[in-house]
């Protein structure tokens, strides 16, 4: 009981943090218990105040001594200690916080539409992005900020090739085609950073409209590459569409009498991408295009092992 009376108050600690008296703050923390350290003062915890002031050593002392509820506290401004640390580029603090954040807090969206992931991408915190992505929900990964950015767009903007590769398979159709408030797409930004592997991956995933948007704002060399890639994919789509029409629509399902050809078609299908083929069939106004796609998917599922070995 006397120990509680003698220990410093949370308010004293926050005052030391506010004036950036790091040495004094550390002395106070050493004398305080979890209940006092976890209190809220003017809507913030001592941890959030310390993150805001960039006092990393103070944060390191606070994190293991605070309650789970206090660590996951959301301020009236819509920040958590993690989103704030990411926005300030405090990599070490983010690294300490991530394992302690609840699923709700790790996916938290701030008032300006950011997540810890979008901030980490913007601040070039590649390691933090890698830690966050497996822990986040699909919705949070695909979050669009108030500026029209996604984590993928920001990663491309910053030239984070590894993060782009991780994110691309996880993006929803709308998010991968997202255009920012400044008129950029992940593809235009990847092109600007000369991330050839990334914009090649994106071309196979993005809609024709989004690609055309990129063509109006990209460098000459990038335009040439994209146009060649689209042309190549269209040739593949055309050949595959013709073969599938003959196979699935010629005489019904029984017309599939050449298994090797179908395996080859599956290989083309994997290269061309389901979405691109669908768009091609619709553009060409092919009858029963939905049926063709469904039958191709069924064939791949049925013979996935053989396709994997041959393709």
Curated annotation (Swiss-Prot):
This protein's record includes keyword Repeat: yes
InterPro entries xref list: Ankyrin_rpt, Ankyrin_rpt-contain_sf
GO CC terms: cytoplasm
PROSITE patterns the UniProt entry points to: ANK_REP_REGION (PS50297)
Keyword annotations: ANK repeat, Repeat
Mapped ANK repeat ranges: 42-71, 77-106, 112-141, 147-176, 182-213
One Pfam entry name: Ank_2
Superkingdom to which the source organism belongs: Bacteria
Protein name per the record: Putative ankyrin repeat protein RF_0923
Organism, scientific name: Rickettsia felis (strain ATCC VR-1525 / URRWXCal2) (Rickettsia azadi)
């Amino acid at each position: 009981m006397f120990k509680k009376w003698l220990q410093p108050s949370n308010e004293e600690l926050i005052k030391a943090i506010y004036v950036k008296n790091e040495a004094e703050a550390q002395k106070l923390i050493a004398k305080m218990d979890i209940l006092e350290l976890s209190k809220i003062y003017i809507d913030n915890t001592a941890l959030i105040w310390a993150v805001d002031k960039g006092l990393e050593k103070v944060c390191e002392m606070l994190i293991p001594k605070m309650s789970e509820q206090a660590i996951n506290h959301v301020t009236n401004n819509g920040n958590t200690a993690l989103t704030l640390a990411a926005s300030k580029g405090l990599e070490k603090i983010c690294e300490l916080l991530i394992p302690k954040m609840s699923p709700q807090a790790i996916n938290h969206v701030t008032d300006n539409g950011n997540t810890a992931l979008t901030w980490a991408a913007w601040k070039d915190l590649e390691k933090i992005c890698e830690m966050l992505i497996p822990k986040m929900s699909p919705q949070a990964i695909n979050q669009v900020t108030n500026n029209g950015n996604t984590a993928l767009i920001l990663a491309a903007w910053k030239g984070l090739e590894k993060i782009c590769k991780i994110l691309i398979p996880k993006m929803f159709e709308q998010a991968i085609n997202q255009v920012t408030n400044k008129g950029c797409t992940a593809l235009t930004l990847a092109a600007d950073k000369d991330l050839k592997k990334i914009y090649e991956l994106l071309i196979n995933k993005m809609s024709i409209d989004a690609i055309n948007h990129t063509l109006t704002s990209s460098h000459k060399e990038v335009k040439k590459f994209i146009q060649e890639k689209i042309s190549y994919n269209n040739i593949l789509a055309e050949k595959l569409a013709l073969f599938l029409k003959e196979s699935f629509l010629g005489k019904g399902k029984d017309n599939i009498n050449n298994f090797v050809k179908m395996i080859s078609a599956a290989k083309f299908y994997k290269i061309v991408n389901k979405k691109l083929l669908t768009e091609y069939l619709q553009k060409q106004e092919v009858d029963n295009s939905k049926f063709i796609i469904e039958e191709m998917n069924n064939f791949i599922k049925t013979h996935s092992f053989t396709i994997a070995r041959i393709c």
